[in-house]
């Protein structure tokens, strides 16, 4: 695999040079300052390439070209936004980009209730607490009919939790849940979030699935034409939130998407942390089943409080948690060997250590939530060690790698 590192641009407190020192071979980045739905300007794409080269690395993967809410709901200026997405692919390809990640989560991107939860050894990790989330939905956001989405026991727990919740915790929940895309300055107030939720009235799971297929039917031919692999990131967490449907949460969801637009250019961002929040997602099996269409990998682990769906969980160390990371990496390097033997030019799959706990100096550095320097360095080193061991000519898998 090609070891990459997410960089949020010049505002990122973790530099490209830091990434290189951590062992990264390439950078994952995006133009977060460009308004969602607009075409990415050529000069801005060039500036990002140059900024990354100045740090000693190259821009390997775009994460993400955001998909607008207009496209997801097929309202407003959605057709023009699709045309702009297509043109952005053309411009990225002309600059040398070959992999573009995106997601189709409605309204909210990845959602956590606590961005700096203290672990058993004093590190800080991101956590999704189901009771806190229900308390937010019912008692803080006050979403109409929210109570119908939760079982009686959780309604009771959420009411009790909210009654004991200090004002600082109430404010923090609103900030954490209403945050926008990672790297983006955008976010929602409670009123704005309720308004966004209303825009999905009448859009059920089947309708949102079809809107995704309609989007892919338009952009995949352009991706094929310009030599880019587009890859869908899963829902995080992988179940409905705030009454909104989610459509990339399971093996079956991905199978549907890939079969409906059956092109190698239409592929998967395999995020083990996102899908791993569900106990019924067998990540090594999923990695093997969709291996031919995996274009980008996020390796992350979570520990669930229970095996129910939904559940509470936290982002554990990369080799801890519920996902067998050794088995996942074995499936990926086996696929790389198969592609190499087939002569595919995309035989090396870009991977990044997804998120990381705040440890050591991370605790005072103040990086983007989930993206500390030392926590990710540790994760990348551990993952690299597994890959090197499995790829060893004498002791590892027969990968055919020279």
From Swiss-Prot:
Its EC number is 4.2.1.8. One of its GO terms (molecular function) is ferrous iron binding. One of its GO terms (biological process) is D-glucuronate catabolic process. Its cofactor is Fe(2+); Mn(2+). It comes from the Bacteria. InterPro entries: Man_deHydtase (IPR004628), Xyl_isomerase-like_sf (IPR036237). Disulfide bonds: none annotated. Keywords: Iron, Lyase, Manganese. Pfam families: UxuA. Pathway: Carbohydrate metabolism; pentose and glucuronate interconversion. It catalyses: D-mannonate = 2-dehydro-3-deoxy-D-gluconate + H2O. Belongs to the mannonate dehydratase family. NCBIfam families: PRK03906.1 (NF003027), uxuA (TIGR00695). Catalyzes the dehydration of D-mannonate. This is Mannonate dehydratase 1.
């Amino acid at each position: 695999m090609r070891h990459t590192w997410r960089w949020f641009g010049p505002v990122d407190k973790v530099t490209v040079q830091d990434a290189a020192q951590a062992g990264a071979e390439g950078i994952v980045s995006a133009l977060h300052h460009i308004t969602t739905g607009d075409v990415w300007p050529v000069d801005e794409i060039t500036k990002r390439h140059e900024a990354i080269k100045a740090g000693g690395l190259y821009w390997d993967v775009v994460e993400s070209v955001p998909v607008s809410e207009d496209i997801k709901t097929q309202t407003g200026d959605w057709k023009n936004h699709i045309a702009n997405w297509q043109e952005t692919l053309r411009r990225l390809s002309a600059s040398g980009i070959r992999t573009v990640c995106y997601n189709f989560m409605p309204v909210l991107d990845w959602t956590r209730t606590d961005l700096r939860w203290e672990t058993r050894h004093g590190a800080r990790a991101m956590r999704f607490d189901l009771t806190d989330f229900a308390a937010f939905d019912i008692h803080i956001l006050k979403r109409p009919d929210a109570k119908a989405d939760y079982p009686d026991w959780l309604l009771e727990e959420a009411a009790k939790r909210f009654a004991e919740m200090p004002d600082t915790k109430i404010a923090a929940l609103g900030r954490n849940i209403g945050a926008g895309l990672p790297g983006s300055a955008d976010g929602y107030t409670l009123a704005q979030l309720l308004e966004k939720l209303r825009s999905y009235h009448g859009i059920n799971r089947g309708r949102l699935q079809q809107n995704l297929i309609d989007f892919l039917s338009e952009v995949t031919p352009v991706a094929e034409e310009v030599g880019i692999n587009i890859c869908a990131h899963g829902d995080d967490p992988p179940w409905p939130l705030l009454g909104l449907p989610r459509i990339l949460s399971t093996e079956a969801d991905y199978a549907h998407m890939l079969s409906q637009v059956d092109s190698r250019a239409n592929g998967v961002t395999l995020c083990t942390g996102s899908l791993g929040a569900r106990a019924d997602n067998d990540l090594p099996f999923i990695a093997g089943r969709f291996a031919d269409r995996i274009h980008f990998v996020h390796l992350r682990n979570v520990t669930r409080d229970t095996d129910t769906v939904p559940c509470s969980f936290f982002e554990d160390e990369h080799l801890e948690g519920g996902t067998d990371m050794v088995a996942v990496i074995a499936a990926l390097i086996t696929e790389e060997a198969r592609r190499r033997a087939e002569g595919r030019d995309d035989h090396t799959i870009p991977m990044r250590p997804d998120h990381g706990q705040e440890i050591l100096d991370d605790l005072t550095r103040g990086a983007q939530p989930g993206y500390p320097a030392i926590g990710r360095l540790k994760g990348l080193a551990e993952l690299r060690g597994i890959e090197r061991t499995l790829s060893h000519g004498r002791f590892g898998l027969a990968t055919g790698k020279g």
